[in-house]
Design a protein with these regions (language model features):
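Bacterial N-terminal signal peptides
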Residues: 9-18
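Short beta-strand elements bearing conserved aromatic residues within extracellular beta-rich modules
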Residues: 115-117
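A short beta-strand element within beta-rich, extracytoplasmic domains
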Residues: 96-109, 158
């Protein structure tokens, strides 16, 4: 999910070479998740494109599936949610060897997001793919790339634990 501003929370992950973007300067100002896209070794596409997406909720028309719609340059489409923690879960339909993710949280205002990204083959037993629960670095327009040894997962879940915007909405 490449988000210009991974409405992060939302959640965004990137594949090795593919990005999905979401976010808009007109988004709900209190709590905006990131966008996500994912890739696998040897796979140049966004593994999250067309995937089933569920979330703990959404704000207005900022539906979960907008976090992985592949419209990286459409600033008017993103996933937004209020409350902490909030989560976004992506079902790729079948287990895939995932080796990279890229998250694009909303970066204006120097926001610092705390979140974790987990993967699962069955949607019940989760393994950590990326842990930003102690993050102290502000989000930027480059997003946050994560590379790791290939992990076989069907589901990817990003859980936003907080931000420094003065509220958890």
């Amino acid at each position: 999910i490449r988000m210009r501003r991974f409405l992060f929370p939302l959640c965004s992950v990137i594949a090795l070479t593919s990005f999905v973007q979401a976010q808009s300067p007109d988004r709900h100002p209190l709590y905006e998740p990131a966008l996500v896209s994912a890739g696998a070794t040897g796979d140049a596409g966004n593994l999250f494109a067309g995937a089933k997406v569920t979330a703990s909720g959404h704000y207005g028309n900022d539906r979960p599936e907008l976090a992985v719609d592949g419209q990286a340059n459409n600033a008017g489409k993103y996933w937004g949610c209020e409350g902490i923690p909030v989560w976004l879960q992506i079902d790729m339909g079948k287990p895939r060897a995932l080796s990279a993710l890229h998250v694009w949280p909303y970066w204006e205002g120097g926001r610092i997001y705390k979140y974790k990204i987990e993967g699962s083959e069955d949607g019940k037993n989760w393994k950590m793919l990326a842990d930003q629960s102690s993050n102290s670095i502000a989000a930027t327009s480059e997003g946050v790339p994560f590379k790791f040894n290939p992990q076989t997962v069907r589901y990817v879940k990003i859980t936003f634990l907080g931000n420094n915007a003065g509220n958890d909405k």
